[in-house]
Each structure stands twice: as structure tokens, then as C-alpha cells.
Amino acid sequence: MENHTNKTYQERMNKTALSKFDVIEKHLDKGIKLLDFGSGFSPEFIKQVQQTGAHYVAYDVSQIVQNQLKENNIDFLTKEQLVNAEDEFDVIYLSSVFHELMSYLSRPERRETFAMLDKALKPDGVIIIRDWGHGRQPRRPVALEVTSKDVNDEVQTWVEALIKNSIINTPWITEDENDNVIVPYIYKHVPHYLYEIMFHVVWGLGSLERESKESYALDYHHIDKWICQPYNYKIVHQYEEYDETYLPHLQKYFKLDSLPWPTKIIYELKKEAC
């Protein structure tokens, strides 16, 4: 789906440019060739990469993004060019992209995509995935309380859309001692479903149609299944990112003192020696 006509989407992606760069800075140096897969157009991030001396190359299926890259003289690949690339990149970076591949691509399309990336990476290269994820959480139900009646209907609209699109199962809504639903709602479910609700809602209803079709609760099992096992990679480093700039936006909708779950999880993958 074309995200780049949406002003809110582009602004949100550009605001996270610093976090996006921090993840890969240690891998960049003069002569390093980076493929930013599913790049979008983030001028500040591109500038930061180029200032390290690394060679930045973008890849995005969006014609709008390709036009922006072309107008700004940024190197990018078409799909035909990427399909033919072999042992070309030192670093392949998927930032907020893996969950979209899981959400929108068929199984054959996923296999084709990851085979293409494996072929394009140098034997000693690294794949870095930065994406949504709730981390390793207990399976017991927890609560997520809506801030006020003013936003209660908006949150419930998201919940209903996520249920309809099979992103979550129906959460419990807390009742009082007389079996009346408490308003504003207090949702109860296992953490990964509440994670989906919390980070979807913060986009606002203008993004409902697009974002409600995407699953955010990724974990290492997805990466192991689709990349590590088929192509002999190992997750050599994994850590969580807590971006506190999300908190005031989340507090508009939910009673939170701090971020209960990570905003992103980072995975570094290296090819196993044969």
C-alpha cells in the first residue's frame, strides 16, 4: 500500500531519523556500502549516513519515493537491479519494514524477497532489522486503561478494526460489581495484543485504514523462520529501544507513567560460517 502520500506518515518517519541512524552508526565507515531496504525518503538520515563516508543506496517500491530520490540525486535501485545484485552490500537495513513484509506479502513473495536480500549481501555482511516488537513478555493478561471518555470511542474504533483484520483477539473490557462496563474502558489481554492496540491508536484515525491491516507484535521467531533458518543466519545481537518521544502521544489515549513496552526491537543478523 502507498504510504508516502500520507503527510502524517512521512512526518512520523522523518522524526525518527535520529533513532534510525543510531542503530547502524557503528557499522558505517568509509567504503561501506549500505542498502536501505524500504527506505522511504528521509533526507536527514541519508545525510547522516553519507557523513560517515559510507555509500548510501536506497530501495523502495514506491514511485513517489523513487521520484524524490531521483530529484535529490540519491542512489537507488529498481527491483530489477536489486534482483541482479550479488555480494554487493556490507549492510542491509530494514527499519520499520519487516512488519510490512509480514503483513502484506504472500508466503512466496516473502521467500523471493529474503532470497533476493541474501544474494545481495556480502558473505561477511550484516542484516539489521529495526521494527515494532513487544519483547519477551509473560503470557498472563494485563490491563490498559483509556485516559478519558473523550477518546474512548476513538480507541474502541481502532480495537474493532484490529479485530476485524485479525490482528488481535477480542480483549476483555472491565466491568464494575454490578456488571456494568466501566467507562472509559479498561482493556485486559495478554501483552502482545495490548501492544498492538496501544501503538496503533497513537497514529490517529486518519491512519486507520492503512495501519489497522498491519501487525506490530513481531518477535525473533518471525525472523528465525523467514531469514535465519532458510538462509543460515544467526541473530548475533538483539536489544530493545524505548523512544520516550512516543510517551506524550500515548498519554493522550492511555493512563501511562512510562512506556510499558519497547517502541522498537533491533536485531543484527550475520551469516553462519559453512
Which sequence ranges carry the predicted segments?
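Class I SAM-dependent methyltransferase Rossmann-like catalytic core
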Residues: 1-26
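A conserved beta-strand element that flanks and buttresses the S-adenosyl-L-methionine
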Residues: 93
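Short glycine-dipeptide loop
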Residues: 121-127
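Conserved class I S-adenosyl-L-methionine
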Residues: 128-168, 179-186
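Core SAM-dependent methyltransferase catalytic element
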Residues: 251-274
